[in-house]
């Protein structure tokens, strides 16, 4: 069977369904795929297809996720849905599926529940920038006032976590009825996707962001200078660009890129995804090392203290067998290197058990190029015991 060609004319966005268990996330995912395939052509997905989520390994953590794709008139979407609550937490923290926006599913019959709150908080912490709300199971509630109350409750909850609760689109529908093909409820799915199309902005492409490349290796070429190799994480770099070497050292160092090579060939420029060697002017071999990053000046800064949202691996996932306490000192693995850090648990939290997720503050012994949303692993003796994401920078 010939593979379908990927249509690049439409903008691409990554979204996912979030919300409390049994509020209808997977049914909604199936309904969107089915309704849009009727409207746009393409393949429908059944509930069973999506619910049997394959296990994936992301940085040693086992996560069950389903990936579904569909398109609207203007966009192509990759949609991620997770069967279990723990899978969501892991998915969002590891960034296994980076989301440009999310659809928060809330059952109109139950209103917001504990996981609704937790998923909104996680979205805030890990940087899911935009949410649209789908109030599900509205066919089961015939009291208009009750629906309005639930909507107000959801909006208040979103505002509590710094989302614009008053402006977020809230669509009332029934995923199950839409999946069963009832036209009035199918219309609500179309309305939902119109809201997603218009409310969730087109994500900035990796190549349009400011240049950054984590340094993987460094070597000197006699007579030419020092070369740093690595994979460009974002943006573009051209010969003649000024870049900063950031991290580990107290001060960032500025230098000019005098050559860009890929597969032993010279290039004019390189962009996100390319594995390159960058020749740096006036940089001694010992002035740059693995773990630092090359970046557009001023675009990212070195830090030691931050708040993080962390998932601690369970024993079954190969994590710790025992809890840890405040002042725990593991290695924090950022991009290409380990740095020792000190964990401080929030007030009133005495210890963290394997399998938990927790917000903690971390102090690294050396500065690293960090920003909100930077992902890291926590390691002990080379094995991964946790995964986290920088929620806010403190110093």
Swiss-Prot record:
Spell out the residue ranges making up region: G2.
60-64
Which subcellular locations apply to this protein?
Answer: Cytoplasm
Q: Where does GTP bind?
A: 19-26, 81-85, 136-139
Region of interest (G1), residue spans: 19-26
Q: What is its EC number?
A: 3.6.5.3
A GO molecular function held by the record: translation elongation factor activity
Q: Which reaction does it catalyse?
A: GTP + H2O = GDP + phosphate + H(+)
The enzyme class is: hydrolase
Query: Per the record, which residues fall in region G5?
Result: 174-176
SUPFAM superfamilies tied to this protein: EF-Tu/eEF-1alpha/eIF2-gamma C-terminal domain, P-loop containing nucleoside triphosphate hydrolases, Translation proteins
Q: Map out region (G4) in residue numbers.
A: 136-139
Q: Positions of the region G3?
A: 81-84
Q: Does the keyword GTP-binding belong to this entry? A: yes
Residues involved in Mg(2+) binding: 26
Q: Single GO cellular component annotation?
A: cytosol
By sequence similarity, the record places it as follows: Belongs to the TRAFAC class translation factor GTPase superfamily. Classic translation factor GTPase family. EF-Tu/EF-1A subfamily.
Function according to Swiss-Prot or TrEMBL: GTP hydrolase that promotes the GTP-dependent binding of aminoacyl-tRNA to the A-site of ribosomes during protein biosynthesis.
* Quaternary structure annotation from Swiss-Prot or TrEMBL: Monomer.
Q: Which HAMAP family match?
A: EF_Tu_B
This protein is called: Elongation factor Tu
Protein source organism: Lysinibacillus sphaericus (strain C3-41)
The organism's lineage is: Bacteria, Bacillati, Bacillota, Bacilli, Bacillales
């Amino acid at each position: 069977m010939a593979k379908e060609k990927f249509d690049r004319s439409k903008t691409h966005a990554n979204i996912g369904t979030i919300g409390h268990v049994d509020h209808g996330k997977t049914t909604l995912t199936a309904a969107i795929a089915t309704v849009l395939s009727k409207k746009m052509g393409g393949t429908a997905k059944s509930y069973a297809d999506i619910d049997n989520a394959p296990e994936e390994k992301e940085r040693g953590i086992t996560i069950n996720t389903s990936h579904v794709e569909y398109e609207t008139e203007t966009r192509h979407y990759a949609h991620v849905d997770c069967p279990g609550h723990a899978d969501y937490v892991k998915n969002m923290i590891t960034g296994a599926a980076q989301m440009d926006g999310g659809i928060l599913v809330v059952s109109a019959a139950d209103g917001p529940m504990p996981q609704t709150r937790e998923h909104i908080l996680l979205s805030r912490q890990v940087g899911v920038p935009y949410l649209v709300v789908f109030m599900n199971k509205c066919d089961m509630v015939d009291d208009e006032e009750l629906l309005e109350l639930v909507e107000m409750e959801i909006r208040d909850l979103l505002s509590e976590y710094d989302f614009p609760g008053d402006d977020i689109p809230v669509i009332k529908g029934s995923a199950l009825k839409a999946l069963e093909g009832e036209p009035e409820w199918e219309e609500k799915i179309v309305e939902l996707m119109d809201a997603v199309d218009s409310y969730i902005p087109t994500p900035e492409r990796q190549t349009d962001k400011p240049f950054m490349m984590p340094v993987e290796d460094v070597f000197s070429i006699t007579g030419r200078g020092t070369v740093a190799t690595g994979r460009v994480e974002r943006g573009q770099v051209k010969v003649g660009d000024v870049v900063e070497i950031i991290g580990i050292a107290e001060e960032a160092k500025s230098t000019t890129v005098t050559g860009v090579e890929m597969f032993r060939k010279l290039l004019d420029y390189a962009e996100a995804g390319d594995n390159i060697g960058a020749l740096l002017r006036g940089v001694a071999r010992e002035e740059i090392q693995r773990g630092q990053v090359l970046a557009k000046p001023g675009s990212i800064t070195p830090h030691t203290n931050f708040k993080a949202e962390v998932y601690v691996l369970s024993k079954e996932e190969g994590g710790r067998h025992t809890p840890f306490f405040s002042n725990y000192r593991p290695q924090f693995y950022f991009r290409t290197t380990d740095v020792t850090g000190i964990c401080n648990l929030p007030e009133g939290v005495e210890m963290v058990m394997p399998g938990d997720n927790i917000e903690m503050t971390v102090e690294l012994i050396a500065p690293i190029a960090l920003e909100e949303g930077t992902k890291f692993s926590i390691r002990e003796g080379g094995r991964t015991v946790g995964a986290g994401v920088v929620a806010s920078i403190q110093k």
